[in-house]
């Protein structure tokens, strides 16, 4: 089993964990349907960048 030699400080622990944060999801509004959606994703109505991609 691995056992640490010395106690890690709160500062070093925080620096190590600084890359663990989840990125904030980017949100956009479609030009045509005015629907809120994630960036680079199709809307629930089937629009992507103002063009109807999927017929429901």
Swiss-Prot record:
Q: Where is this region: Disordered?
A: 1-23
Ribonucleoprotein recorded as keyword: yes
Q: Which InterPro entries match?
A: Ribosomal_bL32, Ribosomal_bL32_bact, Ribosomal_zn-bd
Superkingdom assignment = Bacteria
Ribonucleoprotein recorded as keyword: yes
Gene Ontology BP terms: translation
Its GO CC terms are: large ribosomal subunit
Family from the record: Belongs to the bacterial ribosomal protein bL32 family.
UniProt-recorded name of the protein? Large ribosomal subunit protein bL32
Q: Which organism is it from?
A: Blochmanniella floridana
Name of the gene: rpmF
């Amino acid at each position: 089993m691995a056992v640490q030699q010395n106690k890690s400080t709160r500062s070093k622990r925080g620096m190590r964990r600084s890359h663990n944060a989840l990125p904030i999801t980017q949100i956009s509004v479609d030009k045509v349907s005015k629907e809120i959606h994630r960036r680079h994703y199709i809307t629930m109505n089937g629009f992507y960048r103002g063009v109807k991609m999927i017929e429901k």
